[in-house]
Design a protein with these regions (language model features):
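C-terminal beta-signal and adjacent terminal beta-strands/loops
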Residues: 344-346, 350, 356, 749-766, ...
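Membrane-embedded beta-barrel scaffold of Gram-negative outer-membrane proteins
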Residues: 453-457, 624-675, 681
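Short, acidic, small-residue-rich periplasmic hinge/interaction motif at the N-terminus
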Residues: 32-39, 75, 82-119, 143, ...
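Gram-negative outer-membrane beta-barrel transporters
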Residues: 543, 652-656, 675-760
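Periplasmic N-terminal accessory/gating domains of Gram-negative outer-membrane beta-barrel systems
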Residues: 72, 126, 152, 159-169, ...
Length: 855
């Protein structure tokens, strides 16, 4: 018995001794030499890479591959076999698995849904309900960014997270004291889309995943994935939010009000996504800080953090090429630049051909005189945009920013013809469209509880057309110009961690010019209007773990009309349990600038809308129509269910907009040239179900709405809205086949748009000396349902430790479904007693491909 005790003691001692021996670290150079002798191999390495490294010896029973795996796990070096004898040792192309736990600095609570991304890539994950995450195949020399809305982001080097024991680090995020509007859903529909607690949606372009059919994170195309947001004619220059027209959307770029949104006259977003870091879309319950946009607010913000190393990227697709740079100048000063230009004026891709055909339907480019053959017509189109932002941090408490943005579309249309002297001559018509914006911002932190913001902006929009009409030897010149300047001052007082008070003042001056000149007969008309607006606003924002309330009011004073408009705002969300919440939103809003269509062939028939300013019957010109200030009242109520990355969102809404004009709606019936004011009323329900995980995301959205006009002077006075889309369904599925390979497939189905038929058997009538179409009851018929299936694929790859690339391919309308998006009628030139039907078609099968490199 005594001997047994000594034997057990001796075994424990021997095991302890061996354990201590194995845990002792020895120089890596010695280990390499012993491996070379044992396995008859040769290591190739730089002496300085290994000389200062000491690790535990590998197990003596390991084979060669197990031994190399041990070295790889214990060092930051990459041991790689070239053949049966030679092994390379380097610090290049080392891939790691990174793990960690994200917690709040305030209470050490885990942060569920934090975003963890490898910088300059689309690769990332979200933390689980314990705040834990794991990222595989991460380059050693890369950086990861950990972010969570409502908290300050952290950027961490992958190398700093390495440890021999494979222990996951704890990463602490500090609360961002500037906002109580916390994130509600971290991965909404796709990577980079998030939903805030106030119901607004945030699009983070740098982290944005793919959507069906898109090869770029097109800002205004992407937001159409949201329920209640769509374009009835496939144009981002005509985004309809809850039944509203495009001019009823307030579009801001770094606090600069923009009046133009699309390249290719509506098919491509005019806002370069590479430096546009965040886009917030609000449909209701808007902060009292914002006015205009009686349908929605689309607020874009560029990157606002100083970079300490040069970063940038270049990209190309079948339409355009672009580049961007983030340039550190000093520790306190940086410059961000971006630019994009199409090459459509010297290369016509299949994508360009489809876009061209879609954009210029019914324009003079496709419907001009039959006396001029197609061989005698030519056109040249190109677009470009650029942005620049200067960032200066005086210190941690005072930050200054200056911005510039420029957007341009240019179209030349040339016609060759035979003149009266029987000589060949040519005329070139031109259309140019530009929006230039300048802005500045000063953010000041005066204490832990008080901050201020001062903003000023200048925005100029103009569309100019020179139209040579060969048949009548007439030159028509048209111009529409908008010039707006504004200043805004905000102050935010933080009472405690749950309650904020926002106060502010805003001043804006807007001038709009419309000019028309005709050469034969000679005619000139120039009209310019100016309107000054003063506004004060205030709102309280409260948020705790159960209740979120934002209540505010905005008072607008229009100096020209001596008119005051009060705008209350409400945004309320009550959490009933960990899964269920109720929400209630409401707002009054107004806008003084709207778009109208005078004639369908204005501006070559390509961009026939022009901006005008409200006059409130305050014009001395008897030819001026009455243009009131548009005013909206909106309310919505709904509930949310959110559990295990499954989101169910149902919301009923009601919206009434008064002060619209007939010319503002673009009628194709008897009301086309009528001067009248009226309103529209839309009510409906939005439904969304969204399931996400680290490898996939799928969603189904459905909107039912009824949208009716009311014009007292028309007969009938009440009839369906031009964009009365009763049913709209969107379905999509994203899946990560591999860590660096993602596919997306989705479809759209919606009811056909209303249109007006001529009276059967009496299709035309005389109106004075003219024969016109005799339309039946307005908007009493509907086009066939719209259906489209889109697909995309994205492949990410590493060119080096510091350079990454992505290759994307996408197809719009995979099955080449022919959809009619508009229908109207004209008098038949060969038989004036009948009318001919004209259909505008949607995009056919349209492929695109893009290649992007970031460094």
């Amino acid at each position: 018995m005594e001997n047994s005790k000594w034997i057990i003691f001796l075994q424990c001692f021997i095991q302890l001794g061996f354990g201590q021996t194995n845990s002792e670290k020895v120089p890596l150079t010695e280990i390499i030499t012993s491996i070379e002798n044992k396995f008859d191999v040769k290591f190739s390495y730089a002496h300085e890479d290994v000389v200062n490294i000491s690790i535990e010896k590998p197990d003596a029973n390991f084979n060669l591959q197990q031994t190399l795996n041990h070295l790889n796990s214990k060092t930051l070096l990459n041991f790689k076999t070239l053949d049966n004898r030679y092994i390379t040792v380097s610090v290049i192309d080392k891939m790691m698995t990174v793990c960690g736990t994200v917690i709040s600095a305030e209470n050490n609570a885990p942060l569920f849904g934090a975003s963890i991304y490898i910088n300059n890539t689309n690769k990332g994950v979200i933390s689980d309900d314990e705040g834990k995450f794991q990222l595989e195949h991460v380059p050693l020399k890369s950086f990861i960014t950990i972010s969570y809305l409502g908290f300050k982001s952290q950027q961490i080097s992958v190398e700093s997270l390495f440890n021999e024991g494979g222990i996951c680090e704890t990463i602490t995020l500090e609360e961002n004291q500037e906002t109580l509007n916390q994130v509600l859903i971290t991965k909404f529909l796709t990577t980079g889309l998030q939903k805030l607690i106030d119901g607004s949606t945030v699009l983070n372009t740098e982290k944005f995943g793919i959507l069906p059919g898109l090869t770029e994170p097109d800002i205004l195309q992407s937001i159409q994935a949201l329920p209640g947001v769509e374009s009835v004619n496939e144009s981002i220059a005509n985004i309809n939010v809850r039944g509203g027209t495009n001019d009823q959307n307030l579009i801001l770029w770094d606090n600069i009000k923009m009046y133009h949104s699309g390249h290719f006259f509506g098919l491509i977003s005019a806002y370069n996504p590479n430096l546009t870091n965040k886009v917030v879309v609000t449909k209701n319950g808007t902060s009292s800080e914002f006015s205009d946009g009686v349908s929605s607010t689309i607020n874009m913000s560029t990157k606002d953090v100083l970079t300490h190393k040069l970063e940038g990227g270049v990209g190309v697709n079948l339409i355009s090429a672009d580049a961007f740079l983030e340039i550190p100048i000093t520790k306190k000063l940086a410059l961000h630049l971006s630019g994009r230009r199409s090459f459509t004026d010297f290369f016509a891709s299949p994508t360009y051909d489809n876009y061209f055909e879609r954009s210029f339907q019914d324009s003079e480019l496709t419907t001009n005189s039959d006396n001029i053959s197609e061989s005698n017509r030519s056109s040249e189109f190109f677009f470009y945009d650029y942005t620049a932002k200067l960032l200066f941090d005086l210190n941690e408490n005072h930050k200054f920013r200056a911005n510039i943005i420029g957007i341009s579309n240019n179209l030349d249309y040339k016609e060759n013809y035979t003149n009266n002297d029987n000589q060949t001559d040519s005329k070139t018509s031109n259309l140019s469209q530009e929006n230039i914006g300048l802005g500045t911002n000063w953010n000041a932190v005066w204490s832990d509880t008080f901050t201020t913001d001062f903003m000023a902006f200048y925005s100029k929009y103009n569309v100019d057309a020179i139209d040579y009409r060969v048949e009548t030897d007439q030159k028509l010149t048209q111009s529409n110009e908008v010039l707006e300047t504004g200043v805004k001052m905000n102050s935010k007082l933080k009472f405690n961690s749950h309650l904020n008070l926002l106060n502010g003042y805003q001043f804006s001056e807007i001038g709009i010019l419309n000019a028309t000149t005709v050469s034969a007969p000679s005619y000139d008309r120039i009209k310019k209007d100016v309107l000054l607006n003063h506004a004060v606003f205030s709102e309280l924002e409260f948020n705790n773990t159960q209740t979120y309330v934002r209540f505010g009011v905005r008072a607008n004073y229009f100096q020209k009309f001596s008119k005051v408009l009060m705008e209350p705002r409400l945004n309320f969300r009550q959490k009933l349990s960990n899964q269920f919440a109720l929400k209630l939103q409401g707002e009054f809003k107004n806008q003084s600038a709207t778009q109208i269509v005078d004639f369908q062939d204005d501006f070559l028939g390509v961009e026939n809308r022009r901006w005008i300013l409200a006059n409130e019957k305050n014009s001395s010109d008897p030819n001026d129509r009455n243009i009131p200030i548009s005013e909206s009242k909106q309310g919505s109520f709904g509930f949310e269910f959110n559990q295990n990355n499954l989101v169910l969102d149902v919301e009923a809404f009601f919206k009434r907009v008064e002060g619209i004009t007939a010319s503002n709606q673009g009628f194709y019936n008897n009301f086309q040239y009528k001067n009248a004011t009226g309103s529209y009323e839309v009510k409906g329900v939005e439904f969304l179900v969204n399931k996400t995980a680290n490898t996939y995301s799928t969603w189904l959205s459905y909107t039912y709405s009824v949208n009716d006009y009311k014009f007292e002077s028309f007969t009938p006075s009440k009839f369906p809205n031009n964009i009365d889309i009763r049913h709209s369904v969107s379905l999509a599925f994203n899946y990560n086949l591999l860590d660096n390979l993602e596919v997306s497939l989705g479809g759209i189905w919606r009811s056909g748009q209303p249109f007006t038929k001529p009276v059967s058997g009496n299709e035309t009538i005389q109106d004075g000396s003219q024969t016109v179409v005799n339309y039946d009851t307005p908007n009493s018929n509907n086009l066939d349902d719209f259906m489209r299936l889109d697909a995309s694929v994205n492949y990410n790859f590493d060119i080096s430790d510091a350079v990454t690339g992505s290759l994307r391919a996408g197809v719009l309308n995979v099955f080449d479904k022919e959809n009619t998006i508009n229908r109207y009628y004209e008098v038949n030139p060969n038989n004036p007693e009948s009318a001919i039907q004209i259909d505008n078609k949607s995009l056919g099968l349209t492929p695109n491909i893009s290649l992007r490199v970031r460094f």
